[in-house]
């Protein structure tokens, strides 16, 4: 089977879960350089798209190779112009993709990809399928909920996720992955967090928020509307079809993901591969194949060298 496009999650798939920084700075939470180079090379041959719970502001700086960004679990999907490669100085957390747990915070590298200076004129189109009145109403509720959680749970961080125009708060992530004993925190404290969220939802809104929990991952996501990776996958494929209208052949899609919220996308893909980037996590994935994070770049390079014709052999002896 020849792969026509690659759709991928970001957090935990292209960048290890343990490396995602809460400062949201441009130098943090980057794809390891070796893997990033390979993905850039692939994007010159076939479409590469990101399907993520992260927002546009976070993803745009880190995934300039992407043709389409489906952000905040599909709440907003953007089609982008192709960025040009440019070498600039940046700080990278990782020397390479050999071991996701070996941080090298002080490592300096002279390569960064796809520097964008067009002040977001790279956006060809943006699509938000949900009712904007509901999004606006629940934006205020999400902001209030984030503040209340921050006051009552001092040792967690809150990531606010905005639409690309920064006008609507469409989701929040309640994150405690930075805690040394986060597994204990998940067992003992996460249930209290869930109770607070549900009380807030029941007492404050005519439009119910959507809560995404995980069996082993150290965070909770709350969104302004119901959303999932299946809908995000469908939105991405629909946008791709518009750009390939002259080709009536059905495209074959490879999907990469790492958590339970990727399962709906796994089911839609022709080839689905789960990526394991943290040994402490044991999510229940419905993918066809599993690879370790430090094997991903090897597999993708093999796929490229094989002219994007997928076979099981590409996953042997990684």
Indicate where each model-derived feature is located:
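A short acidic/small-residue loop/turn micro-motif
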Residues: 21-24
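Mg2+-dependent phosphoryl-transfer enzymes with acidic/Ser/Thr/Gly-rich catalytic loops
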Residues: 223-318
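Short His-Asn-centered micro-motif
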Residues: 8, 51-54, 256-258
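Active-site phosphate-binding/coordination module
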Residues: 17, 29-97, 106-160
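Short, well-ordered alpha-helix to beta-strand connector turns
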Residues: 3, 45-46, 66, 73, ...
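Conserved acidic, metal-coordinating active-site core of Asp-based
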Residues: 144-254, 260-268
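Asp-based phosphoryl-transfer active-site loop
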Residues: 4-19, 266
């Amino acid at each position: 089977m020849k792969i026509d496009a690659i759709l991928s999650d970001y957090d935990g798939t292209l960048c290890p879960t343990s490396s995602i920084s809460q400062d949201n700075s441009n130098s943090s939470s980057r794809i390891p350089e070796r893997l990033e180079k390979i993905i850039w090379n692939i994007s010159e041959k076939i479409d590469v798209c990101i399907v993520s719970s992260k927002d546009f502001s976070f993803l745009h700086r880190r995934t300039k190779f992407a043709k389409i960004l489906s952000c905040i679990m599909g709440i907003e999907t953007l089609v982008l112009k192709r960025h040009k490669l440019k070498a600039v100085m940046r700080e990278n957390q990782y020397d390479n993709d050999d071991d996701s747990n070996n941080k090298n915070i002080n490592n300096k590298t002279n390569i960064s990809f796809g520097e964008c200076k067009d002040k977001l004129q790279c956006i060809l189109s943006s699509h938000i399928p949900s009712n904007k009145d509901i999004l606006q109403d629940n934006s205020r509720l999400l902001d209030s909920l984030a503040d209340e959680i921050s006051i009552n749970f001092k040792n967690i961080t809150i990531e606010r996720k905005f639409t690309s125009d920064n006008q609507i708060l469409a989701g929040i992530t309640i994150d405690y992955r930075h805690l040394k004993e986060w597994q204990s925190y998940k067992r003992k404290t996460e249930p209290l967090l869930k109770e607070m969220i549900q009380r807030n939802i029941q007492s404050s809104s005519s439009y119910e928020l959507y809560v995404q929990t995980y069996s082993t991952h150290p965070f909770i996501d709350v969104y302004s509307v119901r959303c999932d990776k299946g809908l995000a996958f469908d939105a991405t494929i629909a946008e791709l079809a518009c750009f390939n209208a002259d080709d009536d052949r059905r495209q074959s899609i490879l999907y990469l993901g790492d958590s339970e919220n990727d399962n709906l996308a796994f089911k839609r893909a022709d080839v689905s591969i789960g990526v394991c980037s943290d040994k402490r996590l044991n999510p229940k994935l419905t993918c066809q194949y599993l690879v370790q994070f430090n094997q991903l770049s090897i597999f993708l390079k093999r796929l490229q060298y094989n002219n994007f014709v997928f076979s099981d052999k590409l996953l042997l002896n990684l």
